[in-house]
Amino acid sequence: FYANTRKDRRARLIDELLESPGHESHMFNWLGDMLRVKDDYYRIGKTYTFHTWLKSQLRENRPWDELVYDMLTAEGRLGENGATAYLLRDASMPLDSLSNTLTTFLGANVACAQCHDHPFADWTQRDFYEMASFFGSTDFERVDTRKPAITLRDDRFSKANLVTLLQPNMERVVFDNTRSTVFPEDYAYDDAKPGEKVVPKFITWEGMRRANVTTKNPRHMRTLFATWLTSPKNPRFAEAIANRIWKKFFGIAVMEPMTNLDKLKEATNPQLLEFLGLLIRDVDFDLRKFQRVVLNTKTYQQQASMTPPEGEGFRFPGPLLRRMTAEQTWDSIVLLLRGPEIDRIKTDHAPNIERLVFPFEFENDKKKIVKDREKIFAFAKTLLTEQQSTKDSNSEGGRGLFMSSTKGRKTKLRGEDSWLRASELPQPMPPTHFLQVAGQSTRAIADDGSTEGGITESLAMMNGEVAKSLMSKVSDTETTQKETTRNKAAKKE
């Protein structure tokens, strides 16, 4: 970089990095923390199709509004449409799902309003339930895969194989016109009665007209909600993601906390946040273009501040000096150990799930599962034949059927297989892994990653597998250099 004498060398480097595979990996880690991406959702199953879908969106540089819209309107089975994983993440908690959606994409912290009027923000419990009613036409079809497996079990296939086969076909997002939201039994306000049906209503912000909504076609409720939320006319949607990206680069958001933008006038610089919201709309929610603008600003290029001044807002004389994230630290170590070829090594377990999706219409009702019994076994037999012909199965009969679809992430990573970018490893890693020790999010709640550091991380850096591998790399490099020097000396003689 320093050898380059071009005046635009910095801008060129920014362009190069934003287009690199490493940036795609970095953005997946960032979104993984925001969207609570995990390999396995409780009672839902493996979500590898979601990982693959999200990475493809980043690779294609899909605009943020389109990406979010697709997640909110996704339909079908998890095994064939990875985007459904976003709604399936909180399938058993629809009110929490709405709360997380509003907090993540609009910076509207409405968690309190699930139980009572928000004490500090302009959100009532009625407002929350009226907004939640737009998810009322969404249902999550699932049946415990273990029970139908027992029903279907015979000598041809094991229970474990049937569970593996059924799971990607059982989890799906559908429209249910018979569903509706009602006020809770402990609703304590005079504007509605407990158990009363909620009439859908949009809650909008200043500068955006209240939408005309009809409930005659409940099928379109979620689509209407997603259209409104991601609309360029919705300033909160633009400002929320702009605020998040600003924090990613500067270490502190224009408005903190970034999950609560209800009082924008209290931001460190309200005019800056408004401008950033306009900017991201001007680039049509292209996250690469937006990041390119931020990274090329004189403000970002200024010397980093050690700590923000106490008792007053940060005026952004430059970014804050801060520790790298766990994923950035890990990826830097992996790059040292394995070199640039690391970006050519990808893990994709989605095909192992996608191949289990039934090629026929299937409704996950217990009685209908039994009716489809022979179809299911015929499909399983086809898969078994394919597996045996390609030597994927090491066992006879049906005992080893489909086991490769889950084995990849359960097997302990060894040797070079463990030195992959964080985005290619299990999401998240186990508690004892360096990534977790260094602050990787557990993905239980959004934005849970930490850059605080601590004694455990320091010890891991000095005495753990990372230190041993780095020292081994240094030793190998020194040995190679000595051999090269000896060879050169021998040639001269």
Model regions: which residues?
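Eukaryotic charged/polar low-complexity linker/IDR segments
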Residues: 421-422, 436
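Primarily short, surface-exposed interaction patches in extracytoplasmic proteins
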Residues: 1-22, 35-416, 436, 441-449, ...
